[in-house]
Amino acid sequence: MAEIKGLVDDHGIIYECNKILPEKYKIKLIEVLAELEDNECHKSHSFPKSQLHKVTGADKVYRADIDKISGWRLHVQYGEDKKLHLCEVLEPVEHDRGTKKKIMKQKKGKYL
């Protein structure tokens, strides 16, 4: 049985995704969340579905792609409790390089 890495959703990100994600991306969201929960992926630093990687210019914030082509993404952070905290879902228009820092500053209450 696989080891599970705890996911924390204090901000209702999964609920928000259910409301705003187009139907065709909801299954992909489940696959990404399952991959993020798989501790083996974290040990091997291999995330084939979500392409989890650090956000450039943001301290301790990581990005997981729900769908890379469409631009739907999740921002997550590793907490002091060694769990992965879901911070927010980014719509395709929100991940543009020029607006990334502005958006994160506006929503800083969602980040650890």
Language model region names:
Residues 38-66:
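A short, surface-exposed loop/turn module that caps and links secondary-structure elements
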Residues 14, 45-48, 77:
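Preference for short coil/turn "hinge" residues that link or interrupt alpha-helices
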Residues 9-11, 40-41, 91-98:
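General structural signal for secondary-structure boundaries
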Residues 3-9, 49-52, 78:
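Generic structural motif
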Residues 1-38, 112:
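Arg/Lys-rich, positively charged N-terminal/basic patches that mediate binding to nucleic acids
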Residues 2-4, 19, 59-112:
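Enriched for short, Lys/Arg-rich terminal
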Residues 28-29, 44, 91:
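Residue-level detector of alpha-helical recognition elements and their boundaries
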